[in-house]
Curated annotation (Swiss-Prot):
Keywords, sorted A to Z: FAD, Flavoprotein, NADP, Oxidoreductase
Keyword Manganese in record: no
InterPro entries: FAD/NAD-bd_sf, FAD/NAD-binding_dom, Fd--NADP_Rdtase_type_2, Ferredoxin-NADP_redctase_2
Organism: Rhodospirillum rubrum (strain ATCC 11170 / ATH 1.1.1 / DSM 467 / LMG 4362 / NCIMB 8255 / S1)
Reactions listed under catalytic activity: 2 reduced [2Fe-2S]-[ferredoxin] + NADP(+) + H(+) = 2 oxidized [2Fe-2S]-[ferredoxin] + NADPH
EC number: 1.18.1.2
Record Pfam families: Pyr_redox_2 (PF07992)
Protein family per UniProt: Belongs to the ferredoxin--NADP reductase type 2 family.
Subunit structure: Homodimer.
Protein name: Ferredoxin--NADP reductase
Signal peptide location: none
GO molecular function, one term: flavin adenine dinucleotide binding
Lineage: Bacteria, Pseudomonadati, Pseudomonadota, Alphaproteobacteria, Rhodospirillales
Length: 345
């Protein structure tokens, strides 16, 4: 059930990845208030959900920075502007507010939150992410207590018996990382070889040889054991059907994330190949007051880089200012002159 009174703000940013957070910062510098909606349970987009400890090399000023640390720094940067986050939900409906002055959009989320804003900045990347869930009976009973699809803090798994399922970078990287804190780490993969960086595969083999990781290959998940949402065991089966039971109190299935633009594709934005065409200079879409930035935005010569997305976020924010403050002049000034609004110089 939706709330009776819409939450009014200047800008709604759809997507809390690095480019979405950059858009929040740029809006804040222009004294525009933001609400942020994201389908994931924590800000950061792919950087948090898939590879928080992977280094990123192409952010200016950082020869190398872990993806999760970049998100932490972006969150620190937007904190003075107190954006309001609406996580674990999607925007499922968008409509123009009849008779609004200035013109406004009404957005409704999958949790019934209703927002009204003069501008919308879509920073949805490839779309709303959701995990590819293994087809196991009673899986839902353990989700959120013993089964998790992302790791935000590895300390939460200290002393735990962890089963990681999957054969890609996320599965291997977290197996390596959690081997330092977990009581036991089992890695279940249906193939004898892993699809990951060669250095990660070598490190995984080394830890397995040292007895710090148990490689359960080639096996697949078969069943979960436990009561009242508390996992006690994971049953796996090999290609011949022979079963093995693993003691476990945590299961981390890393089978990738499925991304889809979902309702965004129905908003009259001319979506092509899961991207939204925009005017490069402004990042405006085909509908006034709606902008797209980052990987979801497309124009001739587009480079899908974080750096490009940061520049697009700035362009979108400066143009959204005129939607939010019609008739008010925007005098461009460098941050070295203005400082950060609300923070003493």
């Amino acid at each position: 059930m939706s709330q009776s009174t819409p939450l009014r703000t200047d800008v709604v940013v759809i997507g809390a990845g690095p480019v979405g957070l950059s858009a929040v910062f740029q809006c804040g510098m222009l004294k525009l208030r933001c609400h942020v909606v994201d389908a994931l349970e924590a800000p950061g987009g792919q950087l948090t959900a898939l590879y928080p400890e992977k280094p990123i090399y192409d952010v200016p000023g950082f020869p190398s920075i872990p993806a999760g640390e970049l998100i932490d720094r972006l969150l620190e940067q937007v904190a003075p502007f107190t954006p309001e986050f609406h996580l674990s939900q999607q925007v499922i409906a968008l409509e123009a507010v009849a008779g609004a002055e200035p013109a406004a959009w009404r957005l409704t989320t999958s949790r019934g939150v209703v927002l009204e804003a003069a501008a919308v900045i879509i920073a949805a990347g490839a779309g709303a992410f959701g995990p590819n869930r293994p087809p196991l009976d009673r899986l839902e009973a353990f989700e959120g207590t013993s089964v998790f699809y992302m790791v935000s803090k590895r300390e939460a798994f200290r002393g735990r018996k962890v089963v990681i399922a999957g054969g890609g970078d996320s599965a291997v990287d977290w197996a390596i990382s959690l081997s330092d804190v977990a009581e036991r780490v089992h890695v279940v993969h249906r193939r004898p070889k892993f699809r990951c960086a060669p250095e990660s595969a070598a490190r995984l083999d080394q830890l397995a040889a040292e007895g710090k990781i148990d490689l359960v290959i080639p096996y697949q998940l078969k069943a979960l054991g436990g009561t009242e949402g508390r996992l006690e065991s994971v049953t796996v089966a090999d290609l011949d059907g022979a079963e093995r039971q693993l003691d476990a109190d945590v299961l981390l299935p890393f089978f990738g994330l499925a991304a889809n633009l979902g309702p965004i594709a129905e908003w009259g934005l001319g979506v092509e190949r899961q991207t939204i065409p925009v005017t490069q200079a402004t990042c405006r879409t085909a509908r006034p007051g709606i902008y797209a930035v980052g990987d979801v935005a497309s124009y001739p010569g587009k480079l899908k880089l974080i750096l490009t997305g940061f520049a697009e976020a700035s362009a979108a924010a400066h143009n959204a200012f005129h939607d939010c403050r019609p008739g008010e002049a925007l005098h461009f000034e460098h941050s070295t002159t203005t400082g950060v609004p609300g923070i003493p110089a």
